[in-house]
């Protein structure tokens, strides 16, 4: 059986994280960057992954579009305008706010499949084990199964409505920013140096939340959890 050909476009924070996680014996993937000098640097930093020309994108089975939302449609249109057909390629939409169903309506001759990332790309790059959401798709069920198997090299894949990614990411961002505001205010009100607020925001708080989620909090943090639970029971 001929090996599937996978490519990726958009080597920013998310695309770069995916490339890194597909190293170390995992499937190699071609990547496209319009700047030849930057493409050479990406290839050097990610051994095993090969730089592609724009013409080669038409020959792939799957093409991951790790592009910003406002660049996705113009990029696809530019490929079509250049003479590429893309009819044999399954285009993987990773843009959180771009609806895959709308892409399939806008480009009926093409095949788009959603694979949305829930989380932060920096965390994916450093730790792997990403979480990806793909919406049930009976029309493209066969290629969806193949896409799920591929992304399982990078993390977990859940079949669910893709809107949950934007909803949960927005909820988490809103609560995190609110907590950051409150922490800055508490540090300031306590008369502490501003440097302490910065350290608490970039180091203490994120690691405490990570430990809470994984159940690995230390004794100091667990005592504070107990105090908070007691306060909740009293109120």
PLM ranges: what are they?
Residues 48-56, 158-162:
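Short acidic-hydrophobic, aromatic-tinged amphipathic segments that line or gate anion-handling sites
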Residues 58-60:
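Alpha-helix C-terminal capping/helix-to-coil transition sites in glycosyltransferase folds
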Residues 25, 45-47, 87, 106-110, ...:
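Short, structured coil segments at secondary-structure junctions
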Residues 106-111, 126-205:
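Internal alpha-helical scaffold of NAD(P)-dependent oxidoreductase catalytic cores
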Residues 183-235:
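Interdomain hinge/lid region at the active-site interface
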Residues 36-41, 99-102, 140-143:
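Short, charged/polar "capping" segments at the starts of alpha-helices
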Residues 1-53, 186-192:
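NAD(P)+-binding Rossmann beta1-loop-alpha1 motif at the extreme N-terminus of oxidoreductases
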Residues 62-125:
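Rossmann-like NAD(P)(H) cofactor-binding subdomain of soluble oxidoreductases
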């Amino acid at each position: 059986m001929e090996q599937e050909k996978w490519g990726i476009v958009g080597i920013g924070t998310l695309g770069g994280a995916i490339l890194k996680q597909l190293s170390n014996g995992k499937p190699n993937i071609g990547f496209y960057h319009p700047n030849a000098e930057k493409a050479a640097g990406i290839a050097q930093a990610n051994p095993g992954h090969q730089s592609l020309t724009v013409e080669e994108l038409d020959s792939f089975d799957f093409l991951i579009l790790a592009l910003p939302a406002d660049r996705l449609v113009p990029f696809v249109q530019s490929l079509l305008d250049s003479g590429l057909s893309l009819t044999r390629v399954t285009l993987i939409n990773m843009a959180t706010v771009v609806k895959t169903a709308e892409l399939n309506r806008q480009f009926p001759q093409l095949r788009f499949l959603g694979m949305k990332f829930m989380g932060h790309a920096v965390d994916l790059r450093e730790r792997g084990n990403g979480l990806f959401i793909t919406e049930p798709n009976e029309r493209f069920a066969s290629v969806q199964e193949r896409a799920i198997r591929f992304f399982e090299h990078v993390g977990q894949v859940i079949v669910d409505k893709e809107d949950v990614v934007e909803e949960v990411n927005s909820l988490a961002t809103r609560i995190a920013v609110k907590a950051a505001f409150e922490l800055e205010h508490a540090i300031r009100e306590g008369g502490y140096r501003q440097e302490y607020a910065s350290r608490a925001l970039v180091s203490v708080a994120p690691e405490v939340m990570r430990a809470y989620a994984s159940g690995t909090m230390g004794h100091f943090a667990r005592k504070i959890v107990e105090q908070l639970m007691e306060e909740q029971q009293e109120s």
